[in-house]
């Protein structure tokens, strides 16, 4: 199973965030910080739950401290972050997805207990259960919306296939179409 481009961007963003904080590793807290700033669905779900990116970053600095900003690139993922990525793969498999998307990272984060990211979420007042429920609800809504749009698209294609655009044909139409009142009036006059 491969990572979606958005997921790869989030992992790279987490590495940049770790480096800016002076940490020589990428942990689950860095992944959470990247997800809170994600402009798409995951960031939206977190913001709806009241997770503020700036406040979360400030709490991460208080809890884990700032390292040395001029360190070389982060040395890799912590075991916690590795488990989070494996959990995201399991979530993608459960949902029969071909790619690991940021939403799957969020679901894995909700299931992961005792992680640094989980601690930051708890401080924000978000439990794993709330996060999981909100994410699943959003994914269900998104799936239903996409299915509805697809059905409407099929209907429109059928309508276009089996109908004619009368406005486009207006120049070739007879001048009597749509003029029932006038025709009835003329017939009434002629019949007198």
Can you annotate each of these PLM segments?
Residues 1-192:
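Histone-fold recognition with a strong bias for associated Lys/Arg-rich disordered tails
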């Amino acid at each position: 199973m491969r990572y979606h481009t958005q997921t790869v961007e989030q992992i790279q963003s987490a590495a940049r965030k770790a480096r800016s904080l002076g940490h020589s590793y990428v942990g689950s807290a860095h992944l959470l910080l990247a997800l809170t700033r994600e402009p798409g669905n995951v960031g939206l779900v977190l913001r709806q739950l009241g997770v503020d990116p700036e406040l979360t970053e400030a709490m991460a600095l208080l809890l884990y401290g700032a390292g040395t900003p001029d360190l070389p690139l982060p040395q890799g993922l912590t075991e916690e972050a590795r488990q989070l990525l494996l959990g995201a793969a399991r979530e993608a498999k459960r949902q029969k997805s071909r790619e690991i998307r940021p939403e799957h990272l969020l679901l894995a984060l909700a299931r992961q207990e005792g992680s640094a990211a989980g601690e930051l979420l708890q401080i924000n007042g978000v439990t794993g259960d709330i996060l999981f429920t909100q994410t699943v609800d959003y994914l269900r809504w998104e799936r239903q919306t996409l299915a509805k749009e697809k059905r409407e698209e099929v209907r429109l294609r059928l309508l276009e296939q089996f109908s004619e655009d009368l406005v486009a044909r207006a120049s070739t139409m007879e001048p009597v179409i749509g003029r029932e009142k006038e025709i009835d009036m003329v017939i009434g006059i002629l019949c007198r």
